[in-house]
Amino acid sequence: MRKRIAALVSICLLMVCLTSFASARASEYFSYTAVYATALDDGEILIEYDIDPTHTMLECGAKMIYIYEGYNNKNFKVVDSFHMDDYPDMIQHDTIIGDGEVTYPGTPGKDYYALVGVYAKDQYGSETIYFPTNVVTAHN
């Protein structure tokens, strides 16, 4: 009986170790990503993104940014969007880093966050993953 329990525990530990190893890097394209929202003066909202790809990319940056507005941290709806086709500075070319920022003229007292589509492309393909920022309240 002890041998069976020991074998079962060993199998469980092996599965946990393999699962942790397999999910350590879930992306072929991104080794690090971060997205932030900051409330600036006069209601302005700053959205920043920072991307470290796994290797040199043909293109890297934000593919799409959706700005959400709500009140009392509820009832959020999309009020604006930024797309890389309209804002080419959102993408860097032939790079090992992708970072940038956009601003939105918010209304003091309202809450904002963004959904940022981080993007990387190499000669074999591309990947886009969407991450939400923190919620901030616009102020004067």
Language-model segment annotations:
Residues 64-65, 75-93, 132-135:
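Solvent-exposed serine/threonine-rich low-complexity stretches and specific carbohydrate-binding patches
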Residues 18-29:
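Sec-dependent signal peptide cleavage junction
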Residues 1-4:
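Positively charged n-region of N-terminal signal peptides that target proteins for export
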Residues 122-140:
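Short beta-strand elements
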Residues 9-17:
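Bacterial N-terminal signal peptides
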Residues 117-121:
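Beta-strand-rich extracellular modules
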